[in-house]
Swiss-Prot record:
It holds the Pfam family GMAP. Residues 20-30 form a propeptide. This is Galanin peptides. It comes from the Eukaryota. The keyword Secreted applies. It comes from Sus scrofa.
């Protein structure tokens, strides 16, 4: 009897190992892809606003309301101005570097010469 139990246990272990390696086990449900509902939930309302293939339902409240735009939030306008200033500063610096590389800075009136007193002291 113990020999029969050991043989049964060994055969069950062998069968489970073979079925797992060959893919004969219980099939796992596959994910089929995105549905409109899951994409709208995960990506938010702004991702699907640009692509409207269904009838628009204006005025009806959905499960969630659209959040106010950045300008409508408190402090949003100030934040936009500071971002604009930072972008403008970066653009001016890049334009300066481009002019400096092209050698056009020497031809502009009112600018100091390219070789400053610090550069002359280092030579």
């Amino acid at each position: 009897m113990p020999r029969g139990c050991a043989l049964l246990l060994a055969s069950l272990l062998l069968a489970s190992a073979l079925s797992a390696t060959l893919g004969l086990g219980s099939p796992v449900k596959e994910k089929r892809g995105w549905t409109l509902n899951s994409a709208g939930y995960l990506l938010g309302p702004h991702a699907i606003d640009n692509h409207r293939s269904f009838h628009d339902k204006y005025g009806l409240a959905g499960k969630r309301e659209l959040e106010p735009e950045d300008e409508a939030r408190p402090g949003g306008f100030d934040r936009l101005q500071s971002e604009d200033k930072a972008i403008r500063t970066i653009m001016e610096f890049l334009a300066f570097l481009h002019l400096k590389e092209a050698g056009a800075l020497g031809r502009l009136p009112g600018l100091p010469s390219a070789a400053s007193s610090e550069d002359a002291g280092q030579s």
